[in-house]
Amino acid sequence: ELWEIDPAKHQPGFVMHTAGWPMESDTYGGAFLYHTEGNKVALGFVTGLGYSNPYLSPFEEFQRWKTHPNVRYYFENDKGENKGEITAKRLGYGARAINASGINALPQTVFPGGALVGCDAGFLNVSRIKGSHAAIKTGMLAAEAAFDALQAGRQHDTLKAYPAAFEKSWLYTELNKDRNFKNWFKYGLTIATIMNGFEQFVLRGRMPWTLRRTKPDYAYLKPASECKPIDYPKPDGKLTFDRLSSVFISNTNHEEEQPAHLTLKDASVPVNVNLAKYAGLEARYCPAGVYEFVKNEDNTDRLQINA
């Protein structure tokens, strides 16, 4: 989200990173709050997709995070009669998926006629929440490899020089030092904090071990019958909001009759598996409300895709 706050509380360059609350300790994620120019504040919430409780809603967790006193402070009036009243104004909203598994999860970055660079490939320094420099560097390395290929009269082949150059670059060294950061969180927030601190500040990223993931994120999900529903507070329309009003200010546009780009191979799976076993988690994990379970005329359920 993008907000405009009271100039008296604005500190250009101020950075806040948080971990833990409101999520459980076994759920990977965290939040950021950056003070930019013109009394603007950019804030966001990251939720790892390896969470176990299907009732969790990344969007609702973000809204709840803003109610923490240390965060709410920047949006409310803390003086006079109207003390505690929200005086800041929300200007924008957005959401995206982040490839944040680190260097150990990089895919094959080259294919005939093309290459993957930047955050889409996973070149993200997870511990520092930095990716722009990696996107620029990998773009440069891929461009140099493409230039050499064109100079040699080659076309539509595989740019093997690009991944080779990456492995010799300072970026590889930087990301390699960060390789265990996310994987430590499978042991919980406390152990992850201790071990990441040890690796990054004591060993300076020169650890002789590498943590490997043994199963994909979705495999950590538990059936709804084994989990407790999460009671999220209703939005107040001042500090916390619902999905519909948020999407409205996201500047997302499409043609009125544009065909949906999301399709189902088997329409029975969302109902017979996801709704029956996991309480319809897709109705919660999408921060734009794209997936919605509705009733048919015969009172049976179906997944409606609002795209």
Residue ranges and their predicted role:
Residues 1-12:
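Central beta-strand plus flanking loop segment that forms part of the substrate or channel wall
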Residues 17, 21-25, 35-36, 217-228:
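Aromatic-residue-lined binding/catalytic grooves and analogous aromatic/hydrophobic interfacial grooves
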Residues 23-92, 159-163, 191, 202:
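Conserved FAD/dinucleotide-binding core of flavoprotein oxidoreductases
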Residues 37-39, 108-127, 284-292:
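Short FAD-binding loop at a beta-strand-to-alpha-helix junction that anchors the flavin cofactor
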Residues 45-46, 120-130, 267-270, 293, ...:
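Glycine- and acidic
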Residues 93-108:
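Acidic, polar low-complexity linker/tail segments
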Residues 122-128, 134, 140, 144-191, ...:
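Active-site-proximal substrate-binding core of FAD-dependent oxidoreductases
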Residues 169-304:
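Ferredoxin-type iron-sulfur electron-transfer modules and their immediate structural context
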